[in-house]
């Protein structure tokens, strides 16, 4: 079934007219857009169309506001407040002349001093020594290594160098004590090492060995052996052995003496004191 299109000629004209009204309302605030359009057409001398039907109405149009007045001329300004001389134009001229020349009074001198002080504050002082460009690696190394660093420690002996020196001195003393210990052990193998307590600061005492007599008479085994010999001699004096018994007794005595000698050698070997190679000192701050 055929239907007429929606956008016919009348609908298109209505859309065009509504667009004109909306554009006029966005630009201007007068109530009659048609009269405004006719006025513009007469001013701009555009081709005019026949006037629309109906009475003509001349409505007032809005105009732009006037610009503000120009500022006053520079010659009409007030005189310089710090000018000397009479008031008015003559005083202003005299004040300008005095200001351009020498200072007129103490106030002007103070003002000039303040300006000079401000200028000196604006100046950047030059660095001493004057910096120079580094052109090679050798120059960079020489400049960085020649710089001296001040010691930031207020208490003497608390810096890293002083603490390292104290540790090194302590280790040297410990090594010296170990050396003397081994030397004494090599000289007297049968001695017993004794260590002294750490001395006070300023006094140095070395470890010493107490010599022990190597004679078998002072040892307990030597004493028992001497007692046995004395008992055997008393028994020999009491008895009067026969030749056969004397030979057997001699053989027995020889075997017994050989056994006693072997036992004495074993006892001597066993009585040897083993000297430890470990240090026998107590580390202390020197």
UniProtKB/Swiss-Prot annotation:
Phosphorylated at C-terminal serines. Residues 222-241 have a biased composition (Basic residues). The keyword Transferase does not apply. Residues 67-108, 184-286 are annotated as: Disordered. It comes from the Viruses. InterPro entries: DUF755, HEV_TT_vir_Orf2/Gyrovir_Vp2_N. Keywords: Phosphoprotein. Pfam families: DUF755, TT_ORF2-like. Residues 242-265 have a biased composition (Low complexity). The keyword Phosphoprotein applies. This is Probable protein VP2.
